[in-house]
Every structure is written in structure tokens, then in C-alpha cells.
């Protein structure tokens, strides 16, 4: 029950999720005091779809990953991941400390066979109302070519299973499209992907093409991916704020904004970061989704929806099968 805004926002998201996803069964881990009012507000039928596990420890945003892993074994974060491992739940969502979540998930769940390190992956908006998957977003700052290759395979599976994209187009993020561009890491990964017929690899893309190019999946190391993600979020906020400011500065602007309101709402819906909340830690033997710590209830709903869709499509099993077939090719 972590997050910057406390359990209230997460419980609102839980209620929304139960209303919008009729097959969803929820297990909520946290302090019993937070759950009491939430349970009272549910109708009898919905209440049967919710279980609660009382946890007397919390991983704070300032806890070091090692502290959370070794000393907070009764925390809500540890409990939800333990439930995934035991099979009592099919997926978990947390708004808590990212480093702690990754450390606990990696330690408890372990990686799938053939996967050296998990990766954080998330959807981002693209032109014409489409979406693109970007990974790694910071799970591993340093990565080798084999790691990038594994990310490409996992991203391809997620795009195919959760967005039903047939043969998703996969690209490597680089400083140019030409073969001579890039460092040794990217060039080696490029060759590995060119030699893999199981991945629909289309070559390099530059930073601006993440949001406008042909790729359905863009692969990079965690250091670069995290910067790209945070930059895109900052630009989205800037655009939204500038549009709001421009529409209230003068009487004419206010009048014009009313005429353009349907168009502005449509634009906002496309770039609103809330609907892209929820970064999946893929490559593990279980589903773990990280929600932004400062996410709204609506944004948290999308993180829950992401976890639900991955569970519904058995994404870890599909990644395992794909990796096994790729290893046989090599």
C-alpha cells in the first residue's frame, strides 16, 4: 500500500478496477485500518471478489533495496510478491519504492530460463492514436548485447499478446539509422537480432522516432531508456500546461479555446500520461507491475489493468516459450 499519496488513492483505483474489470479478483495487502472503510463501501457481490491481507510493515520511499529485502519481510510489498510466487495471485501491482520492488521481485521470483536480467517496460503514445513499447526503463543501468537481444524478444511477446499486434516491429534505439552509427554494444545487438528470424527486427531508430516511427517495440539499455521516458513525461506535461495557459491569457484565447474544446480534449486523451502508467518488470517467473508513486487513482487503474491483461494472456509463459524456441535457433 505504498505510494506518495498513501492507501486512499490505491483503494480508489481498486474500486474503479473492480467496476471496469468484471472478472478481476483482488487481494489487497496493507494495514487493516485502511481497508475497513473501503470494504464497507462495496456492495455484497463485489466484496466477494476482494481478499485482504493485513501487513504490519511498510517499505518507505527512502528505504534502500537491501534494507527492504533483508529487514522488511512482513511488508505489504514483500507479501504481494510472495503471493505471486505461491500462485495465490497471478500478478501484483505496487506504487512503492522502485528499487526495493525490483530487488524483492528479482530475489523471490527469479528470472525465466534463458533470461539474464529482467527489464522495465511501458507503453508510450505514438502518432495516429497508436502506442509503442519502450524497454529497458531502468531495471539494469548496464547491459550487454545479449541482454538487449533478450529485451527485444520479451518486448515482442508483450506487444503481440497484450495488444494483439501480429509480428510486432522491433527496433534498437541509436544515434542514427546508418549501420556505421552506434557503439559496440548496439552494433553487436543489431547483429544478434538480424540473425534471429523469430523477431521482426527493422533496425535502428533515433530518439524522435520512438513517438512517430514504424516500430512497435523500441529497445535500449536502462540508463538511456529511463532518460528517454522521463524526458517524454516532462514534454507531455509541458505541452499540456502550455495549452492550458495559452487558453486563459486573453479573452480571444478563451473564446477560441471553447470552440476548440472537443479537439483539445481529444489531444489531451492521447497524450495524458495517466493512461500509460504501469511499467512491467518482465523476464521474471511472475507478473510485477510498477505504478508511479505519485499516480492518481485513474493512473493506478491503468497499472492494474496492465497487470490484469498480462495475467489473462499468460505473458511469462509466452516469454518462456519464445525464449526456448529462440535458443534452439542459436
What annotation goes with each model-predicted range?
Residues 106-120, 126-130, 134, 214-218, ...:
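Glycine-rich phosphate/nucleotide-binding loop
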Residues 4-61:
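N-terminal glycine-rich anion-binding loop in soluble enzyme alpha/beta folds
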Amino acid at each position: 500500500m505504498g505510494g506518495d499519496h498513501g492507501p486512499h488513492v490505491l483503494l480508489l483505483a481498486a474500486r474503479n478496477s473492480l467496476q471496469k474489470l468484471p472478472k478481476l479478483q483482488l487481494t489487497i495487502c496493507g494495514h487493516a485500518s485502511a481497508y475497513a472503510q473501503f470494504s464497507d463501501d462495496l456492495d455484497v457481490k463485489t466484496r466477494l471478489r476482494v481478499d485482504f491481507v493485513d501487513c504490519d510493515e511498510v517499505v518507505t520511499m527512502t528505504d534502500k533495496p537491501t534494507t527492504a529485502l533483508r529487514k522488511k519481510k512482513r511488508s505489504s510489498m514483500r507479501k504481494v510478491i510472495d503471493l505471486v510466487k505461491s500462485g495465490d495471485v497471478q500478478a501484483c501491482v505496487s506504487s512503492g519504492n522502485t528499487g526495493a520492488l525490483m530487488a524483492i521481485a528479482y530475489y523471490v521470483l527469479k528470472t525465466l530460463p534463458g533470461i539474464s536480467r529482467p527489464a522495465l517496460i511501458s507503453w508510450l503514445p505514438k502518432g495516429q492514436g497508436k502506442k509503442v513499447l519502450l524497454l529497458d526503463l531502468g531495471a539494469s543501468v548496464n547491459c550487454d548485447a545479449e541482454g538487449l537481444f533478450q529485451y527485444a524478444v520479451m518486448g515482442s511477446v508483450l506487444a503481440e499478446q497484450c495488444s494483439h499486434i501480429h509480428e510486432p516491429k522491433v527496433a534498437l534505439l541509436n544515434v542514427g539509422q546508418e549501420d556505421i552509427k552506434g557503439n559496440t554494444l548496439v552494433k553487436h545487438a543489431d547483429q544478434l537480432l538480424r540473425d534471429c528470424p523469430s523477431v521482426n527486427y527493422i533496425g535502428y531508430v533515433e530518439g524522435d522516432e520512438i513517438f512517430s516511427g514504424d516500430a512497435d517495440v523500441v529497445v535500449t539499455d536502462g540508463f538511456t531508456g529511463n532518460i528517454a521516458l522521463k524526458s517524454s513525461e516532462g514534454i507531455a506535461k509541458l505541452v499540456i500546461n502550455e495549452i492550458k495557459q495559452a487558453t486563459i491569457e486573453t479573452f480571444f484565447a478563451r473564446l477560441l479555446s471553447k470552440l476548440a474544446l472537443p479537439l483539445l480534449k481529444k489531444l489531451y486523451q492521447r497524450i495524458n500520461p495517466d493512461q500509460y502508467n504501469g511499467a512491467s518488470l518482465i523476464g521474471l517467473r511472475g507478473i510485477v507491475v510498477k505504478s508511479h508513486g505519485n499516480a492518481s487513482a485513474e493512473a493506478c487503474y491503468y497499472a492494474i489493468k496492465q497487470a490484469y491483461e498480462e495475467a489473462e494472456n499468460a505473458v511469462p509463459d509466452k516469454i518462456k516459450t519464445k525464449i526456448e524456441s529462440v535458443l534452439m535457433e542459436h
